[in-house]
Swiss-Prot record:
Transmembrane segments: 8-28
Name by which UniProt lists this protein: Type IV major pilin protein PilE1
Signal peptide positions on this chain: none
Membrane topology: Single-pass membrane protein
Modified residues (N-methylphenylalanine): 8
InterPro entries xref list: N_methyl_site, Pilin, Pilin-like, T4P/T2SS_Core
Amino acid sequence: MNTLQKGFTLIELMIVIAIVGILAAVALPAYQDYTARAQVSEAILLAEGQKSAVTEYYLNHGKWPENNTSAGVASPPSDIKGKYVKEVKVENGVVTATMNSSGVNKEIQGKRLSLWGRRENGSVKWFCGQPVTRAKADADADAAGKDTTNIDTKHLPSTCRDAASAVCIETPPTAFYKNT
């Protein structure tokens, strides 16, 4: 007598569950990195919004703005914020965004990234990456900060991973002067 088998055997179900588990184990870390990079992109967008004011100040005064007020952007720094960004601060021409300490991917909580300009060949070139500091407003030199508030490089956009080639924008000096 032949009987038709209905449904799946226990072995077949266990194989399917194992395959789903393996796929989830691979996909979850990739998804977490993706969400962290998306959250970091908000910080870069907010920081980039301050570049034109900082560049204009530099071209008009010959030195970098000391803070948000002198740059002509929102002050205090906590006024420039987003869903994932706590504040955006201008200090001696370096624009630094600080991530929130809650409501963001745990790998970037409280971490910082910087955008900074440098005068090169008659224009201002902007760089992005790990937090940097500039000792004085009239200097072009910057020093990379080595501390626990650095965002892991894997979460930065590819243009911000290498400080030597991380040019975000080049602004010619004539871009801020009106022809009269």
